[in-house]
A protein has these predicted regions:
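Regulatory N- and C-terminal appendages and interdomain linkers associated
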Residues: 2-99, 127
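Conserved ATP-binding subdomain of kinase catalytic cores across diverse folds
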Residues: 85-190
């Protein structure tokens, strides 16, 4: 009986060790989307481009230990480059104004208004879980468990759900994936 107990204790210690190791792959909590084939974002005139290739985030890439302990999730979807149109707020629907900053505990967003008083929301694909990480997790260096949990969410789920809602004839939002470069209209939100 003691041998079985020791065996399970050793297995538990190994599992905890592997879990802790798997959380040490990054110390970042939030990372902006990555532009593909653009080395210096400040040297690019995005007004000359109609679209760019962007990966939502490479923050969730994992080695085999991390995949074993925390799962495959949607890691490939987060790091796969997609072609998205470039959007400027001064030309969107004849120009929009920023009403206020929004966002819950995970996303960064801006509430926009068109000249026709139509309200829009500009929301980041990337999640920022900083507010969700408990202090004890930060103290123990385990914040990556919370951060990595985001890899279980598909980065483009809102687009897929809207399409399904359309087929089901259910009222829904109409999300579009765009790239918003630095611009005068964004002012201090750049």
């Amino acid at each position: 009986m003691k041998r079985i107990l020791y065996f399970f204790i050793i297995l538990l210690i190994i599992a905890l060790g592997l879990l802790y190791w798997s959380t040490s792959s990054t110390d970042q909590v939030f990372k902006k989307s990555e532009l593909i084939n653009i080395k210096n974002i400040n040297s690019v005139d995005f007004k000359t481009k109609d679209s760019v290739l962007v990966a939502a985030s490479d923050l969730y890439q994992a080695d085999e230990v991390k995949k074993l302990m925390q799962g495959e999730q949607y890691r490939k979807a987060w790091s796969t480059p997609v072609k998205v149109p470039v959007m400027y707020l001064d030309t969107l629907f004849g120009g929009v104004t920023i009403e206020k900053e929004g966002g819950g505990k995970q996303t960064h967003s801006l509430k926009l208004k068109t000249k026709n008083d139509i309200e829009l929301t500009l929301r980041s694909v990337n999640k920022d879980p900083e507010a969700l990480i408990p202090e004890f997790a930060k103290t123990l260096g385990l914040e990556n468990i919370v951060v990595d949990g985001i890899s279980a969410q598909h980065p483009y789920a809102a687009i897929l759900v809207a399409k399904l809602a359309e087929y089901a004839k259910v009222h829904h939002t109409k999300p579009k994936l765009v790239f918003v470069p630095k611009q005068k209209t964004l002012d201090n939100y750049n």
